[in-house]
Amino acid sequence: MNPVYSPGSSGVPYANAKGIGYPAGFPMGYAAAAPAYSPNMYPGANPTFQAGYTSGTPYKVSCSPTSGAVPPYSSSPNPYQTAVYPVRSAYPQQSPYAQQGTYYTQPLYAAPPHVIHHTTVVQPNGMPATVYPAPLPPPRGNGVTMGMVAGTTMAMSAGTLLTAHSPTPVAPHPVTVPTYRAPGTPTYSYVPPQW
């Protein structure tokens, strides 16, 4: 029988019917009876945590605790002044953390959408949109792309360049080639490793 549901009273040792040896310090009986339940969490009167509410006491907290002056009671349900709350503007977001012009200034609701498994989903744990820098156009080269005529497209210039008469080939320029060491056994026999 399960000793937890045994009808035995508190303090009665277990009926060790199978002769199981318990290690030293193992409780051989039920624990002492638990203390009686008390509805009051603090025994006796506690001056720090007073129970109840004194009628007529203003419920507001003083805005300047050092002066001790309590603001007068107001029937308004809002205990705070109106100036405490920021006013929502009709203009776009202008935050000191979102630099205008340098980065995008969309507020962070979710990460930019990504196409995953052919389904556009939104990653909720992405970085704020203000962190992503604005894309810069690729730099344009100073010269004209090889094989093209300035001011034209590839479709316009390809046929003309391919069918145009080739000029007379230029004679090869004289190039001086340095003299290399003759092949053979090197002057060294062993190079120590570098590690």
From Swiss-Prot:
It is found in: Cytoplasm, Perinuclear region; Cell membrane; Cell projection, Axon. Keywords: Acetylation, Cell membrane, Cell projection, Cytoplasm, Glycoprotein, Membrane, Phosphoprotein, Transmembrane, Transmembrane helix. Disulfide bonds: none annotated. Glycans are attached at N46. It is a multi-pass membrane protein. InterPro entries: FAM168A/MANI. The modification Phosphoserine is found at S6. N-glycosylated. It comes from the Eukaryota. Signal peptide: none annotated. GO terms for cellular component: axon; perinuclear region of cytoplasm; plasma membrane. It holds the Pfam family TCRP1. Residues 43-142 are extracellular. Residues 1-18, 165-195 are cytoplasmic. The chain crosses the membrane at residues 19-42, 143-164. The modification N-acetylmethionine is found at M1. May form homodimers. May interact with DAZAP2, FAM168A, PRDX6, RBM6, TMTC1 and YPEL2. Interacts with CDC27. Belongs to the FAM168 family. PANTHER family: MYELIN-ASSOCIATED NEURITE-OUTGROWTH INHIBITOR-RELATED. Inhibitor of neuronal axonal outgrowth. Acts as a negative regulator of CDC42 and STAT3 and a positive regulator of STMN2. Positive regulator of CDC27. This is Myelin-associated neurite-outgrowth inhibitor. The gene is FAM168B.
